[in-house]
């Protein structure tokens, strides 16, 4: 199957998962998976959230951002990492994360897949 994101409807989700500004995405859903091409404008973010019953994989296409992640042990320290085009991010089931566009002038564009486990 080929998914042509640019031919699908663009969804605009304000304050997605408690984040800042808007998250824009072209999305594909079936019974088991959510796959999307996402876009965060400068200063926009996806809020910190936990993956229960799923994991998430993100491949950064362009821009730069900040990933905040925490293991399933909620007493553990949150880790912060800079992400750049070409980076692949993985959030296992039970872990939490957020993604912020830290650029002042470039969108953060990425593919993401959330398979049901």
Question: What feature does the model see in each segment?
Answer:
Residues 37, 80-82, 96:
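Well-ordered beta-strand positions in beta-sheet-rich domains
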Residues 55-85:
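A short beta-strand-loop-beta hairpin characteristic of the jelly-roll/cupin
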């Amino acid at each position: 199957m080929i998914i042509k994101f640019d031919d699908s409807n663009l969804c605009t989700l304000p304050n997605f998962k408690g984040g800042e500004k808007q998250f824009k995405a072209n999305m594909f859903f079936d019974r088991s998976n959510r796959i999307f091409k996402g876009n965060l404008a400068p200063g926009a973010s996806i809020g910190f959230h936990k993956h229960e019953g799923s994991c998430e994989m993100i491949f950064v296409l362009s821009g730069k951002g900040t990933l905040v992640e925490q293991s399933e042990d909620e007493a553990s320290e949150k880790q912060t990492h800079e992400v750049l085009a070409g980076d692949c991010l993985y959030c296992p089931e039970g872990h939490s994360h957020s993604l912020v566009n830290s650029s002042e002038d470039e969108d953060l564009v990425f593919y993401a897949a959330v398979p049901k486990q």
